Amino acid sequence: MDEASHLPNGSLKNMEFTPVGFIKSKRNTTQTQVVSPTKVPNANNGDENEGPVKKRQRRSIDDTIDSTRLFSEASQFDDSFPEIKANIPPSPRSGNVDKSRKRNLIDDLKKDVPMSQPLKEQEVREHQMKKERFDRALESKLLGKRHITYANSDISNKELYINEIKSLKHEIKELRKEKNDTLNNYDTLEEETDDLKNRLQALEKELDAKNKIVNSRKVDDHSGCIEEREQMERKLAELERKLKTVKDQVLELENNSDVQSLKLRSKEDELKNLMNELNELKSNAEEKDTQLEFKKNELRKRTNELNELKIKSDEMDLQLKQKQNESKRLKDELNELETKFSENGSQSSAKENELKMLKNKIAELEEEISTKNSQLIAKEGKLASLMAHLTQLESKLNQRDSQLGSREEELKKTNDKLQKDIRIAREETVSKDERITDLQKKVKQLENDLFVIKKTHSESKTITDNELESKDKLIKILENDLKVAQEKYSKMEKELKEREFNYKISESKLEDEKTTLNEKISNLAAENSQLKNKIEDNSTATHHMKENYEKQLESLRKDIEEYKESAKDSEDKIEELKIRIAENSAKVSEKRSKDIKQKDEQISDLTQNLKLQEDEISSLKSIIDRYKKDFNQLKSEQSNIQHDLNLQILNLENKLIESEDELKSLRDSQKIEIENWKRKYNNLSLENDRLLTEKESASDKEREISILNRKLDEMDKEKWNLQESKEKYKRELQKVITANDRLRREKEELNENSNNIRIMEDKMTRIKKNYLSEITSLQEENRRLEERLILNERRKDNDSTMQLNDIISYYKLKYHSEVRHNNDLKVINDYLNKVLALGTRRLRLDTRKGEHSLNISLPDDDELDRDYYNSHVYTRYHDYEYPLRFNLNRRGPYFERRLSFKTVALLVLACVRMKRIAFYRRSDDNRLRILRDRIESSSGRISW
């Protein structure tokens, strides 16, 4: 039954009560070896590699199947005890072998063991624990100091790394802000260019509409002119507003470009600073790498020192345990001898000498224990102060560990943020590249649009100038016509009939020419379909030819529009004259004779105008011929252009049809237009003024276009600057990525170091907790024993004999069970030590063989103490040889042993013994529980 279940607070779960105090079942076992008394002595015990020994028969009957000693009732407490030590020669090996390992405990149990002295042994145990606690406290203090220095250095290094990472993080944030600003600037520039493009398109549309209105303006339709004038005035007002807005935007763009140039300069300076800082960080990182390597070497040295200290502490523990065991053994022997002396008065002088020797040894040991106890008592005060100091240091270490953990989390977060920032920066650089290409395309489109707008503006300017001149001439002619119209009435009728006839003839001719043109266009389309294959090879030439063709088309359009205007003017004049003649027939009858001459002159003028129109028609024909020639030259034009040509030709045909319809409608509307002519004259004068203002506005627009061209050049410069800055950002990003990888590696190394420190600190805390728990358990056990002593003394008079017998039997059983347990553990320990020795010997031999095969010799300063170096099987500078083997009796580590009857019999015997021992163990546990309950009930204390 485990005694720890009755201990308070459950702090001694691993302990078991014995007469000498509490011990742990694994840690505090002694290292003595149980030796069988029937074992055959080995003369070559030191040289186990010399070869296998022949089989020898055991001398005792106890190890055979015929043994019946285990089954006797008298051996209830002696089943698993070690036997008498016999025929064991002293070990010839010297060095690190423990002389007390193979101590025989059978002498301790030759006779009945008297009652032990638990209080005295408890005091010895307490002194021993105090000494161990003091030694371990010193070791923990040294370790704590070393760990504190190392932790401080690590914390300082980590703080430096954290500051560097924070600075890099701040710089990366600034770079991100700058990149976002540049992207926003790109977006604003893109929006502004789109707005400019839309405005230019709107201006182009308005100019086209204006040109159409000017071209399709009717001289005699005064209401249409008034409406057109009002529309033009509205459009001019809108254009002026738009021009103002465009100017404001242009000024804003200029200001933005200045601001961006300043920002770019500042960014360049910041980039230079960042480059310098990155170089400094690299140099610092290299220095820190060297420092880390140096610290790693120091850590290794310190770990080696710690291992050595642990080994020394274990050796000291073993020595103390051995001394305790020796003192116990001597006390037990003394007690046995005293009992024997009291029982048997006639004892030999040899035993008296042994008693004296044992008493002297006990006295010496007690003096040593007393001195050590005094030293321990003196050192306990120091230990208390050291423990307080240690607690303070541990609290500081915990605080710093928490700080390190928070900083490590911050480092992880910053590392993740840096990686995200790098990814975002890469994506932004890609998007920047795409946006830059889009901006380049848009700039090219804007340049083309500006070129087209300039052309259209110059053309519209020439058209407006021509219109103004023609309108001035028309006004003068109309004034003369108003005066002379009545006189020319009679002549105009004849001339009108002739002109109508000639007009019909010209219309028929125009229709014939139109049909011929359509046929030629169809032929040209067929030729164009044949020459599509050649278009791909001559794309550059076609582009220039396309521009020439567009110019020629524009010239054709102008000529056709001028021809229409002249035809309309002539028809308008004819209709006006007809209307005037019809209205003024009554008034003109008296003045007819006078006006005939004037009408003749007008007829001559009209004939001249008709001749001019015929010349214009012939010029149109020549233009069409030129168009044919140019079209033959432009055989490599694209299919889209052909489609546009067809549309334009259809538009021309529709315009011709519309012109015919307009001629008919003009004939009907001329009667109404004469009445409104004067009003129209005034309107025309106003329009003249308006057109003059339009000239001025056109010159302003030209200035604006020049300003826009300058802005486009500036935007191109900004684009190149931004591309350069983009490349710089890419280089910086690569540097930041490399720095981030380096910092990540350093952080991992720091995490490893911090984990090692935490492991060591956890070990220290565990050791400290174990010591404190042991101290508390010992104090409580001491208090409990003192209380039990007091209670026992009070009840001594009542039932002393019965209680003493119970206590004696209880402690006797307890002692015997502990001795058996210790002996079993010793056997296990010796077996494991043998296995370890064989394994290490095999490894050493194999390593020596490998070194010899590779011609590697040990250095001269190798002072390791290894027993097998001096063996005749293998020396330091001789060839490797395997030990001698017997062919008939193959035993040893290199051959499997042959099973024999004796091994099987011994196995069966061991099983029977194990069963018997388990049975007696259970019976002993039951007896112990009964005795403990009886003692506790008799002492007045019941433990549940």
Curated annotation (Swiss-Prot):
GO terms for cellular component: cytoplasm; nuclear pore; spindle pole body. It is found in: Nucleus; Cytoplasm, Cytoskeleton, Microtubule organizing center, Spindle pole body. A motif (Nuclear localization signal) lies at residues 54-59, 726-731, 742-747. Residues 119-799 form a coiled coil. The modification Phosphoserine is found at S60, S80, S529. Pfam families: Spc110_C. Residues 96-110 have a biased composition (Basic and acidic residues). Residues 23-110 are annotated as: Disordered. Keywords: Coiled coil, Cytoplasm, Cytoskeleton, Nucleus, Phosphoprotein. One of its GO terms (biological process) is mRNA export from nucleus. GO terms for molecular function: structural constituent of nuclear pore. The modification Phosphothreonine is found at T18, T64, T68. Residues 900-927 are annotated as: Calmodulin-binding. Homodimer. Component of the SPC110 complex containing at least CMD1, SPC29 and SCP110. Interacts with SPC97 and SPC98. Component of the spindle pole body (SPB) required for the proper execution of spindle pole body (SPB) duplication. Potential role in cross-linking filaments or anchoring other molecules. It is essential for growth. Belongs to the SPC110 family. This is Spindle pole body component 110. It comes from Saccharomyces cerevisiae (strain YJM789) (Baker's yeast). The gene is SPC110.
